[in-house]
């Protein structure tokens, strides 16, 4: 490809924090996360076992226990800081929705919570964010331990984590009310979209009164329908809806989550994955694409399709004109077997470039150092190819986006 450098038209300046990342709450507290592939599975010499339905919930067979991350590790801090200064660090994920903030040392979480976050664990993460020159985005606890579906959300837990973060000198600078609320069954028992709208409005009112400087991000949607509709409208070949695990399980629509809300969000956020990984292939074969497709136009087009699909939602429901992809990865359910190899570099760099031409905003790679889609290998923190690609992107590409005419 030969570019006419003199004739390039500037589109925009990108958010300098575009290449941000996630630290899962389960990494902070210790808990279950997607089971790592074996070296033989990564090399294609061993089949990934299908989900075990005998346990009732087949997802349980795809998970393994991970101990709390050593966020003080010098190697982790050095590598995370090298990605770029001033990035967002998102601490969220499915576990965050049911995490009790045990900052008073009670020793156990009340009934209705799944796990607990100690004061020491949270301070360690705050110190990590400070050490890497980062900015903190979190999502809130919203589960049966806090309130029932027919009871309004209350700020008892939010007050704890916002106060401690501010007191420690690493304030929460942006927040999503609930991680992936489309999957209502994973929030509060009996929860509805109307309950979510009620509670997000209550939270945003509380935020405006107590922490008006904090950016309201949401709805953190993982809805597959917008991308499917966009693909149909543009006459493309049908693919996954981009929602990852949400493509497999029941979910409500983004419109249901936001239509009727009285408090407008500042920045619209969504999650994007190129379908599901080998772990979940048996549950939804049509949402899986093999390694042979990893450099295909169809596979690489998914990031741009997802961003384009959400531009109208950004314009309708938010005020600041940015899209934030608060989880992004090669595949839902922990990433593909090739997510930790050089084959993933194509998707990573392609996503950065396509996204930048479509909208200003931020992409939060999932994850920094957990499971097979992590920039760094869990435990050892050894960098993977997509990590080096992202570091080089930030060193070489700059913040100006041009229309190449291609």
Where are these regions (language model features)?
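Aromatic-lined glycan-binding groove of carbohydrate-active enzymes
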Residues: 264-274, 279
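Active-site His/acidic residue clusters
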Residues: 275-295
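N-terminal topogenic module of multi-pass integral membrane proteins
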Residues: 301-306
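Non-catalytic accessory regions flanking glycosidase/transglycosidase catalytic cores in CAZymes
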Residues: 1-177, 181-251, 255, 259-266, ...
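Ligand-binding pocket segment of bilobal, Venus flytrap-like solute-binding proteins
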Residues: 341
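Surface-exposed cleft-lining segments at the edges of enzyme active sites
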Residues: 294-298, 336-337
């Amino acid at each position: 490809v030969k570019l006419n450098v003199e004739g390039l038209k500037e589109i925009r300046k990108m958010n300098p924090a575009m290449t941000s990342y996630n630290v899962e709450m389960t990494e902070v507290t210790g808990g279950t996360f997607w089971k790592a592939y074996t070296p033989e599975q990564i090399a294609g010499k061993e089949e990934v076992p299908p989900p075990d339905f005998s346990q009732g919930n087949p997802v349980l067979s795809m998970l393994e226990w991970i101990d709390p991350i050593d966020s003080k590790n010098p190697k982790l801090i050095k590598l995370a800081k090298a990605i770029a200064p001033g990035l967002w660090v998102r601490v969220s994920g499915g576990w965050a929705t049911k995490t009790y903030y045990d900052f008073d040392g009670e020793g156990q979480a009340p009934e209705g919570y799944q796990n607990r976050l100690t004061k020491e664990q949270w301070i360690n993460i705050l110190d990590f964010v400070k050490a890497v020159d980062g900015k903190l985005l979190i999502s809130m606890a919203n589960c049966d331990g806090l309130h029932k579906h027919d009871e309004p959300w209350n700020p008892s837990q939010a007050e704890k984590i916002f106060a401690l973060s501010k007191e420690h000198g690493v304030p929460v600078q942006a927040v999503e009310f609930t991680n992936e609320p489309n999957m209502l069954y994973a929030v509060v028992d009996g929860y509805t979209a109307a309950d979510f709208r009620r509670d997000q409005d209550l939270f945003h009112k509380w935020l405006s009164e107590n922490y008006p400087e904090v950016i309201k991000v949401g709805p953190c949607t993982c809805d597959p329908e917008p991308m499917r509709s966009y693909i149909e409208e543009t006459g493309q070949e049908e693919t996954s809806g981009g929602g990852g695990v949400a493509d497999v399980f029941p979910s409500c629509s983004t419109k249901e989550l936001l239509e009727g809300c009285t408090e407008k969000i500042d920045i619209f956020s969504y999650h994007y994955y190129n379908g599901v990984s080998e772990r979940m292939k048996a549950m939804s074969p049509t949402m899986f694409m093999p390694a042979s497709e990893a450099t295909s136009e169809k596979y690489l087009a998914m990031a741009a399709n997802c961003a384009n699909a959400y531009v109208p939602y950004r314009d309708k429901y938010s005020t600041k004109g940015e899209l934030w992809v608060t989880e992004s990865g090669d595949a839902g359910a922990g990433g593909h077997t090739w997510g930790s190899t050089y084959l993933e570099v194509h998707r990573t760099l392609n996503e950065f470039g396509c996204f930048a031409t479509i909208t200003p905003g931020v992409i939060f790679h999932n994850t920094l150092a957990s499971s097979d889609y992590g920039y760094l290998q869990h435990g050892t923190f050894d960098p993977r190819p997509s990590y080096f690609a992202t570091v080089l992107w930030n060193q070489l590409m700059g913040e100006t986006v041009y229309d190449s005419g291609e």
